[in-house]
């Protein structure tokens, strides 16, 4: 939401909890308003957890409420969207496109029509699972542990004063 606003987009959010100072949205509505908000959405971004309330939430009826040419980004959970209904909306051109890194069945089966749709981008949900990443993480950890013991600067250090008190670090030499 913060990035979308930085790009000049109007951000309309839906969530159970009320607006808090600093929330990066122009409007925030309760989930009960979702259906009436969808006709205003050029992009529908789903970043919700999978719960009894969200499973199958975005069905054919709600997809039809999106404007012609809308796009979907789902980085939440695959089962939130009725995948068959989304595929139909993508094939018919009602949806201009979808960016997905989660699916009803994971990993996405090889026979899924999503692989062949030209208006769909697919990426892994957990890019940290890339080949060789575990080895790089272990090497970085060991190097940083050695640097920490020598009171030298760490690679990729995240400075968070809230967590610092839990893990006091000797001052740099």
What do these predicted regions represent?
Residues 75-121:
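Rossmann-fold NAD(P)-binding glycine/threonine-rich loop
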Residues 70:
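Glycine-centered, small-residue-biased loops immediately flanking beta-strands
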Residues 52-54, 80-81, 107, 129:
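Short glycine-rich, flexible loops that bind phosphorylated cofactors or substrates
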Residues 41, 90, 141, 145:
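Hydrophobic "lid"/C-terminal helical patch
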Residues 106-173:
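C-terminal helix-to-coil terminal segments
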Residues 41, 46-49, 75-76, 102, ...:
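Glycine-rich, N-terminal phosphate-binding loop of Rossmann-like dinucleotide-binding domains
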Residues 1-67:
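Rossmann-like dinucleotide/phosphate-binding beta-alpha-beta segment
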Residues 5, 10, 74-80:
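Short, conserved structural micro-motifs that define repeat-unit consensus positions
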């Amino acid at each position: 939401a913060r990035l979308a606003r930085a790009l000049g987009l109007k951000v309309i959010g839906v969530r159970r909890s009320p607006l808090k100072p600093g929330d990066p949205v122009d409007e925030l509505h309760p989930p009960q308003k979702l259906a009436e908000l969808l006709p205003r959405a050029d992009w529908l971004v789903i970043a919700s957890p999978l719960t009894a309330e969200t499973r199958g939430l975005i069905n054919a009826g709600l997809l039809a409420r999106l404007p012609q040419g809308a796009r979907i980004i789902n980085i939440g959970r695959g089962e939130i969207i009725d995948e068959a209904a989304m595929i139909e909306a993508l094939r018919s051109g009602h949806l201009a496109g979808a960016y997905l890194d989660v699916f009803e069945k994971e990993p996405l089966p090889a026979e899924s029509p999503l692989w062949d749709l030209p208006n769909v981008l697919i990426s892994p949900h957990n890019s940290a699972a890339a080949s060789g990443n575990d080895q790089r993480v272990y090497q970085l950890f060991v190097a940083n542990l050695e640097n920490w013991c020598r009171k030298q600067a760490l690679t990729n250090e995240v400075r968070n004063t809230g967590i610092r008190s839990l893990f006091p670090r000797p001052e740099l030499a």
